[in-house]
Regions:
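Single conserved hydrophobic/aromatic residue that forms the stacking wall/gate
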Residues: 157-167
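RNA-binding accessory domains that recognize and position tRNA/RNA substrates
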Residues: 2-159
Length: 167
């Protein structure tokens, strides 16, 4: 358990990223839910994660960031592309818990949870990117270790892909 801002307690759980039954990555899962399913894509930007997550073109997608450290700048009210996070969640190598920028109004992890999104981290995102590049974007599942052990892969193959996600 990690304490942030001396107010919010966030529980990181052990979890799994499941891509096409063949590729299963273990990492840390931060979410109010036990699992989430969405299409995966990747982004190679070094900055602008708040803008990327709030961009409506990423609706119903997990964004795999190839830059290794996400969250250090925090979040503010000026860097939104739209009024909320449209991405289903993010995947990154390291999720920074504290903000280190004079413009930050909240830290990144609290913002993710307050927007009902999720994060999956502590894995090699370069390996995930190579899989997506080679086999294409597909629905993946991010889930807690407990959920994976009980229901896991079965649910992934009964979930339809989103169609016409952007109005």
């Amino acid at each position: 358990m990690t304490v942030l801002d001396n107010k919010t307690k966030l529980n990181y759980q052990n979890g799994y990223l499941i891509y096409n039954k063949k590729y299963i990555f273990k990492g840390k899962f931060l979410s109010k839910d036990q699992f989430k399913i969405a299409e995966i894509c990747f982004n190679t930007s070094m900055t602008g994660y708040q803008e990327i997550l709030t961009d409506p073109s990423y609706k119903s997608q997990f964004i795999n960031f190839t830059f290794p450290l996400i969250g250090i700048v925090g979040c503010n009210n000026e860097d939104y592309e739209s009024w909320k996070i449209h991405a289903s969640g993010l995947i990154c190598n390291e999720l920074f818990e504290l903000s280190s920028n004079w413009r930050a109004q909240t830290n990144f992890t609290n913002w993710i949870i307050s927007q009902n999104s999720c994060a999956f981290f502590d894995l090699d995102t370069r390996a995930v990117t190579k899989i997506v590049r080679n086999f294409g974007p597909k629905n993946i599942m991010l889930c807690s270790e407990e959920y994976f052990e009980n229901k896991g892969i079965c649910l992934l193959y009964t979930s339809p892909s989103p169609r016409d996600a952007i109005p």
